[in-house]
Amino acid sequence: MKNSFYKLLLIPFFLLTSLGAIAEELNVSAQEIQLNKETKITYATGNVQISDNKKNIIFTDKAEYNKVNELVRSFGETDIITSQKFRIQGEDIFFDNKKQVIYSNTKSVITDINGNKIYTEMFNYLTEKNMFFSQGEVKVVDNRNNEYLFSEVYIDERKRKIVGSDVRSFFNDPSFKTNDKNEPRFFANSAYIDDEGVTFDKGVFTTCQYREGKKCPPWALQAKKIKHSKAKKTVYYEKALLKIYDFPIFYFPKFFHPGPTVKRRSGF
């Protein structure tokens, strides 16, 4: 039988793909590369490194490239550094070179340049827009160990912003707790996280202990918008309503209080 494979060892290899006049170049290096000229599939094994001209780099131990579909697939543990220096860790990740999207339907961890981690069940990464999307059970753990649970999120690498819906946020940072019994948390319709802090839309804040199955905490602050400013160390509320056992007590058009890291502040 005629051998349909070409084998290349320990050398970089360039894959040129194009639909029209413009070619997108992928740079592949591995300990061993095999080319199947009949199926037009390239197999790479051993210290595989694949990069595009946007400087997205895929690291894995085994991968294949289907020239017909312009699809790269990794097998097993995979590490990706995006052009904006975000890190993706997961398994069995795909790179659709035709659509310019990197995606996975298995659990992955995305780490941004500030050390915040996003745990996903699936993700799509648009390499042209530097934008992630994920849905399902999405957990964000920031660099202070605070947790945010979303049903879906968008991550904008360029603006360094995370936007998500159906958020439940648990602040585990010790500075947010006045005693061990406090469990500060924000529940909201949506939220976005950036370098300035966190903003919640149509949210509720309380520090009462979380009681699974209970309808309401002893007290809570409900507001149209809640913003925690890291720079000013202050929590701001718009159209806030103080509730005691879910019964409305006071309404404040605007309201703010010092953040938990502030011990004393004159005025209110």
At which residue positions do the language-model features occur?
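Bacterial N-terminal signal peptides that target proteins for export
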Residues: 1-9
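Compositionally biased regions
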Residues: 5, 19-22
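Bacterial N-terminal signal peptides
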Residues: 9-18
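Structural signature for solvent-exposed beta-strand/loop edge elements and short helix-capping sites
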Residues: 23-268
